[in-house]
Amino acid sequence: MQGDVVKALLEALGADVVTLPEQFGSRQVVDWSGLPGKTPRALIRPRNTDEVATAMRICNEYRQPVVTQGGLTGLVGGANVLDAELALSLDRMNHIVEIDRISGTMTVEAGTPLQVVQEAALDADLYFPLDLGARGSCTIGGNLATNAGGNRVIKYGMMRDQVLGVEAVLASGEVVGALHKMIKNNSGYDLRNLLIGSEGTLGVITSAVLRLRPRPRAVATAWCALPSYSAVTKLLEEAQAGLAAGVSAFEVMWAGYYDAVLANLPELRAPVAERYPFYVLLESVGGDPVRHAQAFEEFLGRMLEAEIVSDAALAVSESDALAFWAIRDAPGEYPKFIPDHAAFDVSFSISNVGDVAQRCDVRLRERWPQALVMIYGHLGDGNIHIVVDVPGAGKTLHGEIDDVIYDVTREFHGSVSAEHGIGTKKKAYLEFTRSDADVAAMRAVKAALDPNGILNPGKIF
């Protein structure tokens, strides 16, 4: 029966929307994970929600599996096509529908790139706080499907905290949700939050109402060098008290990460002269630029005087701040010097992060003394990234490295996925984080909304 589905889609939507492999040729059809994917039987590129609904209704009738794709910047294979599947790309649905300055909202289609949203908000003298390294390529739909986190969760929360309304198409072709602008809405089950983070397994998100914030009038950024992990956590504690709600980023980097990226990426420059065990990129936002800058400098002075911070560099220009952020955003350059690395996105209670990092480092080096181990992350929300490369091993050891990291994650009752999702890459380790009852409940929701199992099958569980 599936053999006729492409014909039915072509008849309903036309060749401009439905294309065959020989027509889309070398177009990217896999994400950044490096995991294998298949060429889709056809690529559907709808222009609006009605065309998404038509496509899903036909696919459901034919029991045809469909994978929704955004910017394909995911790192867990969540958007990769498996056997005999169709791909549904939302890249044409990339319009900003409305900016409502009074409500502080932006209504956008799911294929809109994150950076476009950020820039449009600034043009309206507002601010959309979600930010991550793939900002130029990732899309709002993908950010929603994975409940993206990024660099400023410490102040603004995850992607679900930036959304007021969501519109989506179910497997049946029915359109659900509402593009409302209400902060308070307790009218039954929250379908919005059910769809956010579902990795395209429950519905195709087509549009959203995003919550905008007042544009910060002042941004202060500093690069801090610290003598110990206890000093890092003390700096976090002091920053949250001394800078109040202003702390918008607290990015910690262990020395192994800092040394490796500076040694291999000559375009980066060291913010401080000496080498230290830990580094923190601290950012704070506020209202009055003069007062905020003064308060930030005074805070840094107190931290240096108390020897919590050993050395610091204050960004005196936007280019200085961008240079600091370039060091933190260096993971995008890994293919240049560690193309076969294994990467992990895990989260823990903030109080456990230091012990987790130490235990992972010790166990990895016991197994592979020559391994490059890089640890960094968003300490303010307990999310760290661990990158491991064993010289000469290629990707042959990835399974064993996975076991080491996820065993430690289970020991500390952490999450195997802080912000990247599960996809196919982490399926085997979902039980390390979620109970059998949790997974059974998720399967029940999946069966209710997608009884034929056509939406992104083989992902999550």
Q: What is the predicted role of each segment?
A:
Residues E174, K427-F461:
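Activity-critical C-terminal alpha-helical subdomain
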Residues V52-V66, A121-C138, V175-L195, R365-E366, ...:
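Short, hydrophobic/aliphatic alpha-helical segments
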Residues M1-W32, E61-Q64, M303-S319, E411-V416, ...:
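N-terminal accessory segments
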Residues H95-A249, L455:
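FAD-binding subdomain of flavoenzyme oxidoreductases
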